[in-house]
Amino acid sequence: MAASITNTASDEAAKFPRLVPDAYSPQIAPVFAWYVTRRLIPARFHAVRIVTESLEVARSIDSISDPVILVMNHQAWWDPMIGLALAATFWPSRRGVAPMDATQLEKFPILRKIGIFGIHPDDPKSMAAMVDFVQSRFATLPRPTLMLTPQGEFADIRAPLVLRPGAAALAAKFPACRVFSIAIEYAFWLDQKPEVLIRVQPVAGPEPISTTGWHRALTMGMQENGARLAAMVMARDQAPFTTFLGGAASGTNPFYNLWNRLRGKSTELSTSHRR
């Protein structure tokens, strides 16, 4: 069995010399997802919340029989970890793949075990190889999901949205795919830890289908989704959101919280009395 897996990996490396294929492990991937979702993210963030009006959209992804492409804005190192938590929570039956800079992937080889493959973003031949690689995954995986960050690099949430052409080329290449935009923001509200705030919406394809048309559709869809989420983030109100990770009562720090409990006072921070 081990020899078979090794041979398969070698065959793929020879078939796709311009990229680093993923080496998905059905044993390692679920454990990694559990650790990220149940340990790593809750330790670093107060809560992960999704806009309630987009909850059914997120859940519907799990039942789509065709391949799905997910496009996310790219602010931070945490983006793929949040994407993994979304997948584990809302579309757990799908098998995901996602590209990453091959140079960075060399530093974190375990990520290949969860479906990450390496590309050379500035090499046109590597980008062309990615299309062929994705096509091979779409043809062999059951209900595959491709997660992309089309900006291609970290970008401030306030900066104008500029997308590289790869995502549009892939969407045009696979017209049967369903495409969704995932907007993410990291914000400090009342707790000492930040919130992760998410909104999901479908992206309608262009008519006729073309790379240029998809580039325009993705740009407009991601801008609209991001703007709607931003308005809710600035309102600093958790009411329009559904919390799916964390979300315990806000506090300042363990010592202050203990002191307040000893005095019989609530440790929760709130500004509702001012409304």
Where are these regions (language model features)?
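Short internal beta-strands
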Residues: 96-102
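Membrane-anchoring hydrophobic helices of lipid-metabolizing enzymes
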Residues: 1-84, 95, 108-116, 195, ...
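Short helix-capping segments at alpha-helix termini
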Residues: 89-92
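Short, polar loop motifs at secondary-structure junctions
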Residues: 102-106, 185
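Non-catalytic C-terminal accessory region of glycerolipid acyltransferases
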Residues: 2-24, 128-275
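Hydrophobic/aromatic beta-strand patches that form the interior of the parallel beta-sheet core
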Residues: 99, 117, 180-182
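Glycine-rich, highly charged phosphate/nucleotide-binding loops
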Residues: 48-53, 123-134
